[in-house]
């Protein structure tokens, strides 16, 4: 399992860091078997796994439930679990209680929280021993306000993002996720920080990349963002389900190959 120090060392050696989301035991097992460096249990599970319209409906209980499953499936991978909407920003005491509950009950290596406004929370969480990954740029929990669009696209916005990135690092963040920002801006931020910067829709100038498992494998999704490359096609599973349906209806399944050979009814009838 990678440690924070090893991830920082990868950045220093210019070794790119791979990160993929996982939301359950089997997907986590696959990601670990592939040798991916980090797993993100993202609140994107609301759409990909639970069928919600957005991340807004995801609860702390949802994140704990799925985080536990992922840890069981990937015991040797660095796991980061998202703080869902409403878990940060109420009061510092409640925020820290939520963070501690999520961190302890999932046995994660770190938690992730969105936005530049959480800098005080990062400081306090770090002080009590909870590693925090920050998330800037497009923050899905705020799409109701900012929408799904490129962030940092003006001079003022870019300068603010650079400042925000420096501030979350200063507050103690162990890594930073940058989403949907210009490539050159992401590269500039990565150069300014000592912590690993993981990009999603932020070009190749970051220290690593993260993609959503279901997006990159075409698993039950209807829309892919511009920055998503499809690496496999899990939708072919539908063909297998159709074949199963046909074989059940025709009587072709189960054949002798898939049937126990033991005969028992003669013994039952002889006892009558």
Swiss-Prot record:
Catalytic reactions on record: 3-methyl-2-oxobutanoate + (6R)-5,10-methylene-5,6,7,8-tetrahydrofolate + H2O = 2-dehydropantoate + (6S)-5,6,7,8-tetrahydrofolate
Co-factor binding details: Binds 1 Mg(2+) ion per subunit.
Pathway the protein contributes to: Cofactor biosynthesis; (R)-pantothenate biosynthesis; (R)-pantoate from 3-methyl-2-oxobutanoate: step 1/2
Entry-linked CDD domains: KPHMT-like
E.C. number(s) listed in UniProt: 2.1.2.11
GO BP annotations, alphabetical order: pantothenate biosynthetic process
Binding site for Mg(2+): 43, 82, 114
Family: Belongs to the PanB family.
Listed name of the protein: 3-methyl-2-oxobutanoate hydroxymethyltransferase
């Amino acid at each position: 399992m990678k440690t924070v120090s090893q991830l920082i060392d990868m950045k220093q050696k210019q070794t790119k860091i791979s990160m993929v989301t996982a939301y359950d035991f089997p997907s986590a097992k696959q990601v670990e078997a592939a040798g991916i460096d980090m797993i993100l249990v993202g609140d994107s599970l609301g759409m990909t796994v639970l069928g919600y319209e957005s991340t807004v409906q995801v609860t702390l209980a949802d994140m704990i439930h799925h985080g536990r499953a992922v840890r069981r499936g990937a015991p040797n991978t660095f796991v980061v679990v998202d703080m869902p909407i409403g878990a940060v920003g109420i009061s510092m005491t409640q925020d820290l209680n939520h963070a501690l509950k999520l961190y302890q009950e999932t046995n994660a290596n770190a938690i992730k929280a969105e936005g530049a406004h959480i800098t005080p929370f990062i400081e306090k969480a770090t002080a009590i021993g909870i590693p925090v990954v920050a998330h800037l740029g497009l923050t899905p929990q705020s799409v109701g306000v900012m929408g799904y669009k490129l962030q940092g696209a003006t001079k003022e916005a870019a300068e603010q993002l650079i400042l925000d990135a420096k501030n979350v690092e200063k507050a103690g963040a162990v890594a930073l996720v940058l989403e949907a920002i210009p490539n050159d801006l992401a590269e500039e931020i990565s150069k300014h920080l000592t912590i690993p910067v993981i990009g999603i829709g932020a070009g190749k100038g970051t220290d690593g990349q993260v993609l959503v498992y279901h997006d990159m494998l075409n698993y039950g999704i209807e829309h892919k963002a511009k920055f998503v490359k499809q690496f496999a096609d899990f939708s072919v599973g539908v063909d297998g389900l159709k074949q199963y349906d046909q074989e059940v209806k025709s009587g072709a399944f189960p054949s002798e190959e898939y049937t126990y050979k033991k005969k028992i009814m003669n013994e039952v009838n002889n006892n009558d």
